[in-house]
Amino acid sequence: SPGLREIADIIRLGRTTYRKIVVWTINKIVKTFSIVYFVAASTLLLGIPILTPTHMILMLFLYDFVTLSISIDVLRPSERPERWNMRKLVAISTMLGVVKLTELFAALYIAKLINLSYPQLQSFMFHILLLSGLLNILNFREAGMFWNSRPSNYMLLAITIDGIVATTLVWRGIIIPALPLYAIALAFIYVIAVTLLVTDVAKIAVYRLFGRA
């Protein structure tokens, strides 16, 4: 009946909104691990800043567009009622944050292996951090593998534009030191292989351990 259909629509909207809040929360906590903890730990490890203030400002500015697109993303609502469990949500986000830290330190090790200069190493890690952060949302918006559901056009557009802008900056050396093409290609290959596959597998393993967030 029309009345029941309206009630079902309201329930579906509420569950979809809940999923968006969960995705935003996980993304926020993992981003804290990726930016704050990684930058602090790597700077202490190397004895020199891994990112310049310019890198940080650019990264935070470009992240905002994709983060805002979560609010208009098309997410599948849960088939069952969901309950807010902050402790479980933080545990899941922390586990995924540790995974991201491991991936980023592996990228830093690769950057050292290919003998980039110090300014180039900073731009390389900026590129890795930004691309990884953009693609993370594709991981976190879906409980299964990232390709199980399609993001909204706005989210795809924001990710694409941010990726193009960041790549143009490191390729042409605009505002920040330029990277050789082989380093840019390596960053793309690493991020796609690690963020879209390794992180996704880790996410599913964490969900099996703790239950879906």
Predicted regions mapped to residue ranges:
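Membrane-embedded transport module
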Residues: 1-145, 169-172
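C-terminal transmembrane module of polytopic membrane proteins
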Residues: 116, 120-213
